């Protein structure tokens, strides 16, 4: 649905009577400002400025073909006499290429300029290489081999065909060849050659004896491949579409004129019906654009010459442009530009020497949701807001008297610009379905009647903009229209104001709402200028807005919501032909094929994806896949719809989530909750967004929300979809800024469902008759099924049919068995029967049970019901109300369900029975090894002996002594029985306290202190009693000091040994280069990988995981761990075992700071012992040496690769995987995450200054 928009028409001065045009590309791929024109058998070099270099490069008679050879930087010229020469365009020097003694009729080079085809005057086809070596030569009238000729298999005989109005007699008539011209001398005898775009085949059109005009297809080796099927009245022009699917040839029929399209095999495929008669307006030239998008047809009539430009879409040919030229200055030739980036540039040379350069670009003419397509004299309009009408159909067709070249649609106005430079204006297009008024015809004034207007654009209700280029500059024209004073009833348009800009303007953009300024871009340097309309209606160039590195083919000024850049609330969007998209010069994307602006989003497409960019911060917020090659036609903001056209021409309408959310948000901002929910339901948007969009607004306007929703079912749907999640920060975060979201003070996201349901429930309870269904749904979401049933049961008393409907709704939300149980839990048998009857339950299942319950006392009935519903606490409360006769049942029920605390609360007034509960509770606690609590419960239950035993097991010696006293047991004996167990658990100080209080034996007291190495306390006690410290304590303390010193030395040696073994293993592995795992180690046995890693060895496949060991038993797993972390030399995982052992050893060393300090202090207190001070100094020195050795080696043992440090993202994943590092990571995963990091040595002040 694209139209051809004229970007500029540049007028140059060339050479009169031109015959050929040669364009010279630069070596870097750009366009040179020098081109060559062949005129009057001379070659001229012409500059873009229009100055003609009068030096004749070559002068040959009867030039029949010419080509600029890029690789040789030479011009190849063929003459009718048979000469083929090469001309140097710089010096004019010539060299002979080849010579044909019989003369040359036509010459054509292949597109890649590797092969050249000639047709001689004797109708021989000669194929040569670029160095003029003959590849093949054969007569033009040679026949195909028998195996390549067309075969008639007898299908479709004339006798069996339907002949319509001619009747059956037509079947008996013999086929006449009268349609073929017998005298081929009457035909144009020119021979035409055309190559396919890939250079593999070429076609030769000529006049054959007995057949008339026909053509043949040859390959690049000169072999005849196909001949055309018999076709009458073919014309002499022939051109092969560069993409290669069609060969175009004009063809005349009695009732129509066409461009016949043949396939490579010579069979007629389809046709393009021309809007004129070839007899009156014959085709002079056929030319395809280099990209095969546009077919140019040049015709010549008596009064004028025309150029028709056709495009194809969805198998329909659209006539997009018609150029009209007077016979007073006829056309000489057409030539499509073949240079890169200029595929839609057409060069038109006139006999007078004028050179017109037309530059078109494809663009979609859209006015909001209305899109128009030009097709000859018809304008096809479709409003995509109302319907998706696939092309070539449309909702409405406007017909005009002449061909349409451009049209403008803005608001309710429509301007149509025709090929005869008239403008038709219709100012009242409201809807396309209504009858349109007859448009006003605006005639051009004398100045505009001879100008080629480009970039025709709407500017204001009474003005249009256009451009006209000449002599290297461009005039910006402000067009106005008025009534003709001389001829009442006639209107004309004229130039109201103009301003000239240096360079060629190829794009114009007008701000949608600021109608006093617009922007233009020049193709020469990529400058974009801001032009304003002054109060006196004159145009003025204000400034250079932005400088692009390369000029764009499409620019668009867009309004940016809530953003001001440099004082302007807008931005310039530009799209280059190389598919680069920019906003104010900032690159947004590349490989962009189309774009449009919808609300606050820039939507653009790439080959198979669509992206959405927020205009205010230029942030890409979303993307989605589309069909390959699809392009944007238009977007309908009010329906969040984007219309795409696929490569084959059909349309696809989608509603992207980003646009739908934008529309829903706008509706919510305006309080249109009904429409917001309707749009969300239609587009499958989660209804949580209704609340999450603006929580504070929703809470404050909950009444308006309920009043605006007409459908109770929609409220039910809203409530049922609620989740404890903020969708503006999760699923729909693309449309929201998390920093701007605010909540009420009493709101929490993790309690969102309860919060919203409570909020709505309070409002809906005021109008229960209107919100019955949503109220029931809210109770279900809150888990208050009983309240939902009460609402239904209340309606049952007034309207049974309505209650049935409400119950059916509830049964849709809740399982029938759960609902039956809830009804049973209300103890209302009427409600139970009502639910049971509607739930399709078998009466044989519930009626006997209900009858049995009715026969029971009320409290015991409630107990049975609660027990059935597994509401054990409530059941026990009802059982407690039944009295003393149910004590035994209650005690058994408490034991069965573990309701000890509840039972104690319910039977608080039953003192004696409560003691039974205490004892039962104590038995339970003792069974689960909670002996301290069991002792307390036994005491409350009056069983002091059991309380004493339980306290003894926990070594709660203070409580044991208290209970022993209550039981009148000897305290000294009880205390002596506790000393040994306390010492076994390392509680030496508590054992000493018992001995000191209940045993008067001083030796026994000191023995307890010395066995616990509590030397400082022993010295303290000895000092208080004036005992001899050196006699009682010194020997033991000195012996312990010597032992501790030996232990520290052993710890140091063990640490150094482990460290050295680890370093040796790492050094050997680094030298071998085989990683950490030997080739004979089977990783299938390694099942201790950490849960924190997801890595697996390449050997550790899915099969090996299924067949490997599982170690379900904890005993087996511990056994396997011991085997895996064995420190035995030669273990495949010895390095892992050493790291594990070192971590444990360092942790143990760090914990010895306090014992070493205390021991040294005690030794210092032995002033009379000669060996005490040296031993204390040695202890401190040994321990300091040990700590220094450990601290210095930590970083050497726990290396960065062992710690990880983000290596996963660097080389363990992605396309470039370091498999050696991956293998190491798998081994390190065997360690617990804690042991992969070095131990933290928390140092205390353990040293004594006097021992330094």
Curated annotation (Swiss-Prot):
One of its GO terms (biological process) is long-term memory. Keywords: Cytoplasm, Cytoskeleton, Microtubule, Nucleus, Phosphoprotein, tRNA processing. Disulfide bonds: none annotated. It holds the Pfam family Beta-prop_ELP1_1st. Residues 814-1252 are annotated as: Mediates dimerization. Pathway: tRNA modification; 5-methoxycarbonylmethyl-2-thiouridine-tRNA biosynthesis. Homodimer. Component of the elongator complex composed of Elp1, Elp2, Elp3, Elp4, Elp5 and Elp6. The elongator complex associates with and stabilizes microtubules; efficient interaction requires the full complex. This is Elongator complex protein 1.
């Amino acid at each position: 649905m694209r139209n051809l928009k004229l970007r500029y028409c540049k007028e140059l001065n060339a050479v009169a009577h031109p015959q050929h045009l040669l364009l010279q590309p630069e070596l870097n791929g750009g366009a040179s400002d020098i081109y060559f024109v062949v005129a009057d058998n001379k070659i001229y070099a012409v500059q873009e400025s229009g100055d003609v270099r009068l030096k004749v490069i070559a002068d040959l008679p009867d030039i029949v073909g010419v080509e600029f050879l890029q690789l040789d930087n030479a011009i190849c010229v063929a003459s009718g006499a048979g000469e083929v020469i090469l001309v140097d365009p710089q010096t004019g020097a010539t060299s002979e290429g080849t010579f044909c003694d019989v003369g040359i009729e036509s010459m054509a080079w292949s597109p890649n300029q590797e092969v050249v085809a000639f047709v001689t005057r004797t109708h021989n086809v000669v194929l040569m290489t670029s160095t003029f070596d003959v590849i093949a030569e054969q007569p033009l009238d040679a026949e195909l081999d028998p195996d390549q000729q067309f075969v008639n298999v007898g299908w479709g005989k004339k006798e069996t065909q339907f002949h319509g109005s001619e009747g059956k007699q037509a079947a008996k008539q013999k086929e006449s060849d009268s349609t073929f011209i017998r005298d081929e001398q009457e035909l144009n005898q020119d021979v035409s050659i055309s190559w396919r775009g890939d250079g593999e085949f070429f076609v030769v059109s000529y006049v054959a004896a007995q057949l008339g005009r026909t053509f043949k297809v040859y390959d690049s080796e000169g072999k005849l491949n196909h001949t055309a099927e018999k076709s009458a009245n073919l014309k002499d022009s022939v051109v092969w579409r560069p993409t290669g699917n069609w060969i175009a040839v004009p063809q005349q029929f009695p009732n129509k004129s066409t461009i016949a399209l043949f396939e490579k095999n010579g069979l007629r495929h389809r046709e393009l019906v021309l809007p004129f008669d070839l007899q009156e307006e014959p085709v002079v030239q056929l030319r395809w654009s280099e990209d095969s998008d546009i077919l140019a047809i040049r015709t010549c009539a008596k009064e004028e010459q025309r150029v028709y430009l056709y495009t194809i879409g969805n198998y329909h040919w659209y006539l997009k442009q018609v150029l009209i030229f007077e016979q007073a200055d006829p056309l000489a030739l057409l030539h499509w530009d073949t240079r890169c980036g200029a595929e839609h540039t057409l060069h038109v040379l006139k006999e007078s020497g004028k050179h017109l350069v037309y530059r078109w670009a494809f663009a979609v003419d859209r006015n909001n949701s209305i899109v128009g397509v030009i097709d000859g004299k018809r304008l096809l309009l479709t409003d995509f807001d109302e319907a998706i009408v696939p092309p070539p159909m449309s909702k409405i067709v406007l017909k005009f008297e002449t061909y349409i070249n451009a049209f403008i649609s803005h608001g309710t106005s429509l301007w149509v610009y025709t090929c005869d430079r008239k403008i038709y204006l219709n100012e009242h297009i409201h809807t396309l379905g209504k009858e349109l008024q007859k448009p006003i015809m605006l005639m051009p004034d004398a100045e505009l009647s001879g100008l080629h207007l480009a970039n025709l654009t709407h500017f204001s209700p009474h003005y249009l903009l256009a451009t006209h280029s000449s002599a290297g500059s461009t005039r910006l024209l402000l067009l106005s229209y008025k009534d003709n004073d001389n001829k009442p009833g006639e209107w004309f348009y004229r130039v109201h104001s103009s301003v000239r800009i240096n360079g060629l303007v190829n794009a114009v953009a007008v701000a949608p709402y600021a109608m006093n300024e617009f922007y233009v871009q020049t193709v020469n340097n990529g400058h974009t200028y801001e032009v304003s309309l002054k109060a006196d209606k004159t145009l003025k160039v204000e400034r250079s807005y932005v400088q692009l590195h390369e000029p764009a083919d499409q620019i668009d000024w867009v309004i940016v919501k809530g953003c001001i850049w440099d004082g302007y609330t807008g931005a310039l969007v530009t799209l280059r032909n190389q598919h680069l998209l920019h906003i104010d010069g900032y690159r947004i994307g590349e490989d962009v094929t189309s774009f449009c602006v919808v609300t606050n989003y820039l939507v653009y497409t790439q080959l198979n994806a669509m992206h959405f960019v927020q205009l205010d911060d230029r942030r890409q917020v979303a993307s989605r896949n589309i069909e390959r090659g699809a392009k944007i036609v238009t977007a309908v903001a009010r329906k969040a719809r984007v219309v795409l056209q696929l490569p084959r021409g059909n349309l696809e309408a989608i509603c992207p989530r980003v646009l739908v959310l934008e529309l829903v948000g706008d509706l919510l901002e305006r309080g249109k909750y009904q429409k917001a929910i309707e749009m969300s339901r239609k587009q499958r948007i989660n209804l949580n967004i209704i609340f999450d969009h603006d929580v504070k607004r929703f809470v404050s306007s909950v009444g308006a929300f309920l009043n605006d929703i007409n459908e109770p079912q929609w409220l039910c749907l809203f409530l049922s979809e609620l989740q404890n999640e903020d969708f503006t920060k999760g699923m729909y975060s693309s449309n929201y800024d998390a920093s701007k979201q605010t909540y009420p003070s009493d709101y929490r996201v993790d309690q969102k469902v309860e919060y919203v349901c409570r909020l709505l429930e309070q409002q809906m309870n005021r109008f229960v008759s209107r919100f019955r269904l949503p109220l029931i749904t809210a109770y279900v979401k809150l888990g208050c099924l009983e309240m939902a049933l009460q609402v239904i049961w209340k309606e049952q008393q007034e309207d049974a049919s309505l209650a049935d409907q409400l119950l059916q709704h509830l049964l849709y939300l809740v399982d029938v068995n759960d609902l039956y149980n809830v009804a049973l839990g209300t103890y209302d048998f009427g409600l139970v029967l009502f639910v049971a009857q509607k739930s399709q339950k078998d009466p044989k299942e519930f009626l006997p049970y209900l009858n049995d319950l009715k026969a029971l006392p009320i409290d015991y009935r409630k107990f049975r019901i609660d027990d059935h519903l597994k509401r054990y606490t409530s059941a026990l409360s009802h059982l407690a109300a039944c009295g003393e006769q149910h004590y035994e049942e209650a005690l058994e029920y408490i034991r069965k369900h573990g309701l000890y605390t509840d039972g104690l609360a319910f039977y608080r007034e039953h003192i004696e029975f409560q003691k039974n509960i205490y004892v039962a509770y104590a038995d339970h606690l003792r069974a689960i090894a909670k002996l301290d609590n069991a002792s307390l419960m036994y005491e409350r239950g009056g069983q002091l002996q059991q309380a004493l035993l339980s306290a003894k097991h926990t070594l709660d010696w203070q409580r044991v002594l208290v209970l022993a006293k209550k039981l009148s047991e000897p305290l000294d004996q009880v205390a002596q029985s506790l000393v040994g167990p306390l010492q076994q658990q390392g509680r030496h100080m508590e054992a000493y306290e018992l001995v000191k209080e209940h045993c008067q034996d001083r030796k026994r007291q000191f023995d307890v202190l010395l066995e616990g190495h509590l030397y400082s306390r022993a010295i303290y006690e000895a000092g208080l009693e004036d005992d001899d410290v050196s006699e009682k304590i010194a020997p033991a303390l000195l012996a312990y000091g010597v032992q501790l010193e030996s232990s520290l030395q052993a710890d140091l040696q063990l640490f150094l040994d482990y460290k050295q073994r680890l370093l040796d293993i790492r050094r050997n592995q680094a030298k071998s280069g085989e990683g950490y795992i030997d080739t004979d180690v089977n990783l299938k046995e390694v099942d201790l990988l950490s849960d924190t890693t997801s890595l697996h060895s390449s050997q550790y496949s899915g099969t090996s995981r299924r067949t490997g060991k599982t170690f379900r038993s904890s005993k087996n797993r511990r056994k396997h761990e011991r085997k895996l972390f064995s420190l035995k030399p030669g273990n495949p995982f010895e390095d892992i075992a050493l790291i594990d052992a070192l971590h444990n050893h360092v942790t143990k060393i760090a914990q010895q700071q306090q014992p070493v300090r205390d021991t040294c202090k005690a030794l210092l207190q032995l002033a009379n012992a000669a060996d005490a001070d040296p031993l204390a100094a040695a202890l401190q020195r040994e321990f300091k040496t040990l700590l220094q050795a450990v601290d210095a080696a930590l970083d050497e043992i726990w290396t960065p690769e062992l710690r990880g440090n983000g290596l996963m993202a660097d080389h363990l994943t992605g396309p470039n995987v370091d498999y050696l590092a991956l293998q190491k990571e798998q081994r390190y995963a065997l360690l617990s995450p804690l042991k992969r990091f070095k131990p933290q040595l928390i140092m205390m002040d353990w040293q004594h200054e006097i021992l330094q």
